[in-house]
Amino acid sequence: MPASAPPRRPRPPPPSLSLLLVLLGLGGRRLRAEPGDGAQTWARFSRPPAPEAAGLFQGTFPDGFLWAVGSAAYQTEGGWQQHGKGASIWDTFTHHPLAPPGDSRNASLPLGAPSPLQPATGDVASDSYNNVFRDTEALRELGVTHYRFSISWARVLPNGSAGVPNREGLRYYRRLLERLRELGVQPVVTLYHWDLPQRLQDAYGGWANRALADHFRDYAELCFRHFGGQVKYWITIDNPYVVAWHGYATGRLAPGIRGSPRLGYLVAHNLLLAHAKVWHLYNTSFRPTQGGQVSIALSSHWINPRRMTDHSIKECQKSLDFVLGWFAKPVFIDGDYPESMKNNLSSILPDFTESEKKFIKGTADFFALCFGPTLSFQLLDPHMKFRQLESPNLRQLLSWIDLEFNHPQIFIVENGWFVSGTTKRDDAKYMYYLKKFIMETLKAIKLDGVDVIGYTAWSLMDGFEWHRGYSIRRGLFYVDFLSQDKMLLPKSSALFYQKLIEKNGFPPLPENQPLEGTFPCDFAWGVVDNYIQVDTTLSQFTDLNVYLWDVHHSKRLIKVDGVVTKKRKSYCVDFAAIQPQIALLQEMHVTHFRFSLDWALILPLGNQSQVNHTILQYYRCMASELVRVNITPVVALWQPMAPNQGLPRLLARQGAWENPYTALAFAEYARLCFQELGHHVKLWITMNEPYTRNMTYSAGHNLLKAHALAWHVYNEKFRHAQNGKISIALQADWIEPACPFSQKDKEVAERVLEFDIGWLAEPIFGSGDYPWVMRDWLNQRNNFLLPYFTEDEKKLIQGTFDFLALSHYTTILVDSEKEDPIKYNDYLEVQEMTDITWLNSPSQVAVVPWGLRKVLNWLKFKYGDLPMYIISNGIDDGLHAEDDQLRVYYMQNYINEALKAHILDGINLCGYFAYSFNDRTAPRFGLYRYAADQFEPKASMKHYRKIIDSNGFPGPETLERFCPEEFTVCTECSFFHTRKSLLAFIAFLFFASIISLSLIFYYSKKGRRSYK
């Protein structure tokens, strides 16, 4: 026999002192909550959470937590005329030739759905009526503890009223319950899930007639008598809001009556009385022997205020009152409707008598909650939002219910999402919504102290989706509706849910734990400024003319004609903008500083016919001043930027990188930079982050040749004298399969990586040619635009690197299923998406630290054990945010993943560069805030400095490493460094000469005085 319903668990206390302080600051949580207390919820969640609390929450659910999956009779059973079943209102509604307003049952029908020439119906649906073993095997595969299903009223009582029941119908449900007992899965049984027998609709007008409550009681008694010994959780009515409002007011759902709002409220009134009758029946006649629990399944949306004002919060409270409170307050509080409804709907809202209030009050043994797209985002009337904003936030709804209805035990009896009807087994969107909702449930339990006892994923299998027909899918198991056997094939969401149940939540994983340790002594700690502040205004007076001041008359300076002073030599200290930047870098304690040159400023015409020597001098001074304070400059020759992609205007007009001549011009420009700056610069980047996603194949072809030419210029003409290193910096965001269980998604991810990174990396770091994945994919689609390299060009390009430099910012999920046309790439046949549980920046860039480690390992696997630099890594924050905790969290975790890659994976990692230096040149990305012509360090700068000073993340067991202080070589000082002994001897002679001369001078004066 199934175990009895678990006893009520002690209410878990809120776990943290900070949460208690929040509650006390809001007036405290009373021992007994009252209607209206839920309004505190918006204030509690008004401030954004700390980054570590906003993202992935690690933890497990309480012991004995109920893991369930659900289905509804009309959606899945089929067999609409089999074995004496009577017609239901949904049979009639779907067979009706005229669909009500807003109906989309035949929209975008998937392959395998009923013909669009016929109305979509549940006549066959998933055919569960003939497949008990198939369905229960799916339950066994999932590993759930509970299965929620509904009984078809018309299948057990074809006429709807008490009388001779349909034995075949009873046998079907007994067989299902027996099979559940064999598997150790407990049933959660819904008596009414929208499918009223048509006979009762015809005879009484459906739920608009109060007499239907007695028929419902009789039907429930039949079910309790036949099945109650095996059922410990009963749901009387599913989603009475939808039944009343959309069945009898809007007519969007069966029975399709387009009545007045008054009729909708009358139906809801009768539904509440019917529910109460059934609860009292069970409580009096069956609970003593069967020991089960009974409730009503209530659906709700969640709503956020447009502004955090008292008025907006009251409107949000009213919105929930009009949907959830409409039914929850009578059942859980006092037997009557919310005050906001009575005040606004006094003329059309029915009244309960005092005896009816007592009869309805307390008729639920737990709070059965439904939360998902059917109500929250599809069937919620706009006027019930009260001009506020919907949000799929389950955690906040759970907290509101906890406060509003006196801390009930909550059983989430329906929750999930949907995917397109054309989506088959890789239902990534559904899977990530499932993950989000379950994680929010865990947060509600662990962080907010809400007593949630169980969770039900909806639904077990694809089926008929009410007003959406077969245009969407909500099942964990895929059903081909055209097949004869109607096999259930597990989707990615099913595999995810099975793993989650097995782990009982999200236990901390070893790979997600921070690593203690330090980087090598010579590790490069840098910061990036792609658009360096170039200000060539000299700090000294540079006018060579001579002026007289007309003191007596005009009070102005008067130029003296024909008189000029001698031109003074310029010095680096003349550039006023350099020293403040150097001082900030010193304050940060970085060892390296990366900046980009502006090709268009240095060579306005694109060639050396016109060279801006002032700009070159500025860059030379910047580099030399960095070296002087022991900061190594890392210089990029070209950075794609507006305007003209960072190219001289003439080259941009001549086709930019589409023109092969640009590659030759770049090589000459590089030669000039090496010649002018190379004595100070020992790390060069030819091109920084050429963005492949908006670049043509011919442009990429020429860009690769330009890089190779520049590399060879340095290698052959300057390396021996300057002893520097040079490479290209590629953007390398990680691409992760959206469905980790899908081989197709893994193939898609690899394809995108090759197009995003391999396109430029493979010719340089690999074979000298483009990736075969890229070439093969394009050839299959008759796209022959990807150029070919000659053998000489391959030799020219291959191996043109001294290190591998990558810029990494985020991770992107890719899926093979087309779910969102806006984000679908038809060219690569890939759907880009994100895990909605991930932490995001204000610009919606996902924070996924482990992606950095993965891309480093992918690059090592592809191109070998090369020295690597993370040449740029950063995130945006709120405008003018001084306490940028998101960036602190980002840097802490990304750098720690870099440490894991170095220590655990053996990646030859040589340096890390944070992006970006300041907000002036990169607004919202800087480690320094810029306001009122002042630079102010943000919290992230101080945190980064701490990491630099510690050389990583040393722990108590980290071996202390002695790192001798190193100094960057000063080129101008090389003469002195190589002649230290000679210079010391000369200094000694000079010092001795000074002493001797001083003594001679002293005694000569003394001698003269003695003769006077």
From Swiss-Prot:
In the UniProt record, which residues carry a glycan? N106, N159, N283, N344, N607, N612, N694
Q: Which domain of life is it from?
A: Eukaryota
Question: Region (Glycosyl hydrolase-1 2): which ranges?
Answer: 515-953
Q: What is the effect of changing H193R?
A: In HFTC3; impairs the ability to form a ternary complex with FGF23 and FGFR1c; impairs KL-dependent FGF23 signaling
Q: Which InterPro entries match?
A: Glyco_hydro_1, Glyco_hydro_1_N_CS, Glycoside_hydrolase_SF
Pathology linked to this chain's protein: Tumoral calcinosis, hyperphosphatemic, familial, 3: A form of hyperphosphatemic tumoral calcinosis, a rare autosomal recessive metabolic disorder that manifests with hyperphosphatemia and massive calcium deposits in the skin and subcutaneous tissues. Some patients have recurrent, transient, painful swellings of the long bones associated with the radiographic findings of periosteal reaction and cortical hyperostosis and absence of skin involvement.
Q: Any idea what this protein is called?
A: Klotho
Q: Which gene encodes it?
A: KL
